[in-house]
């Protein structure tokens, strides 16, 4: 029997606010254990949560980016469960009145196939702390993450293949990234994904029994985990077995999903309205204010790059792969520089440097202004493309002005025939055999002489001018 795969995803996105959702403690990542905490995070008796308005702002922006309706009146709920990293023994979340509902997002597969995935809801909640199990036999709790604001985005079970799930995550990450509310870095935990997977015979409307899969810390691992889980369930069903409703975790070393626990239902959490956080009324003016503050989407930017700047679809997609690069590009072309040249540098030397140094654009000295200044120096013949690579490394490491560095380092390209001719004659004198070979009909000998000329000028000779002069002198030598 053949089965249809049914997949729904629950994605937690960490919001980039300076303070936590209900406490003034910092959300900064990477501090020593339990240093970014407050009495509210510790749940000391008598302390009360105070709502961070910026979290609701972010929630509205996310809902708008995902084409969702917004609950104009909403409240928070208590989700009750006990775990060491949850000192209150409950999590403040949203149950029946999420901030956003009835949304959708368009996905595109590698083969060009497009589909629309419905989004059931997006709700705000606080993150839990983190447990660490030491080699000394003790377990430790770090509450730095406790209270960090999250938005959980729950899709409908509209995906039918792991490839569609991968495409959905890609589209979702892009949509959230361009709102500016999160950096959505899965490898750093600011985007986390759980998957609900079930199979059903083709033609059957009712869903099969689902399993939840956790611990997928990269896009590729999501696909691997789903591939394994679909295959596992299919083998059980074909053998006449039954699927249990359970939670499983993905082991990225073995590529398998492993049983964690029997799956809980909503009733197990005993949701009820949070009495310490008041109901919020979201006005239409508030929503419109957030809508106006949203930057141009990646999709709109791609259309602008292709239709208005004459860039290729490939270039447009590469430039919008991250918002930081797209923002940098947009700033750079304001300096009246050829968009294609800026695009080439960002995709070429800049991308290679960032990859090799394991850094992001904001962490190096390159700016839209000094990059475009360097490109102009190439265009007007002040420096060669080869010299430009040296200039770029200097700008990336130390910042500053491209023009000032070129002058200070003596890198200005030599284009004056009066300067080049004596050097050419000296090259001829030192390479008489190559000159004789050229005059004897060996055209490649001239290339060797050009190479010697560039070496003699330390790469500063204008290649076009130098080559033209050299050939003229060879013919008259």
Curated annotation (Swiss-Prot):
Any one GO biological process: glutaminyl-tRNAGln biosynthesis via transamidation
Subunit structure: Heterotrimer of A, B and C subunits.
Catalytic function, reaction form: L-glutamyl-tRNA(Gln) + L-glutamine + ATP + H2O = L-glutaminyl-tRNA(Gln) + L-glutamate + ADP + phosphate + H(+); L-aspartyl-tRNA(Asn) + L-glutamine + ATP + H2O = L-asparaginyl-tRNA(Asn) + L-glutamate + ADP + phosphate + 2 H(+)
Enzyme Commission code(s) on record: 6.3.5.-
Protein task: Allows the formation of correctly charged Asn-tRNA(Asn) or Gln-tRNA(Gln) through the transamidation of misacylated Asp-tRNA(Asn) or Glu-tRNA(Gln) in organisms which lack either or both of asparaginyl-tRNA or glutaminyl-tRNA synthetases. The reaction takes place in the presence of glutamine and ATP through an activated phospho-Asp-tRNA(Asn) or phospho-Glu-tRNA(Gln).
Protein name: Aspartyl/glutamyl-tRNA(Asn/Gln) amidotransferase subunit B
InterPro entries linked to this entry: Asn/Gln-tRNA_amidoTrfase_suB/E, Asn/Gln-tRNA_Trfase_suB/E_cat, Asn/Gln_amidotransferase, Asn/Gln_tRNA_amidoTrase-B-like, GatB, GatB_C_1, GatB_Yqey_C_2, Gln-tRNA_amidoTrfase_suB_CS
Organism (species): Lactococcus lactis subsp. lactis (strain IL1403)
PANTHER family: GLUTAMYL-TRNA GLN AMIDOTRANSFERASE SUBUNIT B MITOCHONDRIAL AND PROKARYOTIC PET112-RELATED, GLUTAMYL-TRNA(GLN) AMIDOTRANSFERASE SUBUNIT B, MITOCHONDRIAL
UniProt keyword list: ATP-binding, Ligase, Nucleotide-binding, Protein biosynthesis
First-level EC class: ligase
KW Nucleotide-binding (keyword) present: yes
Stated family: Belongs to the GatB/GatE family. GatB subfamily.
HAMAP family for the chain: GatB
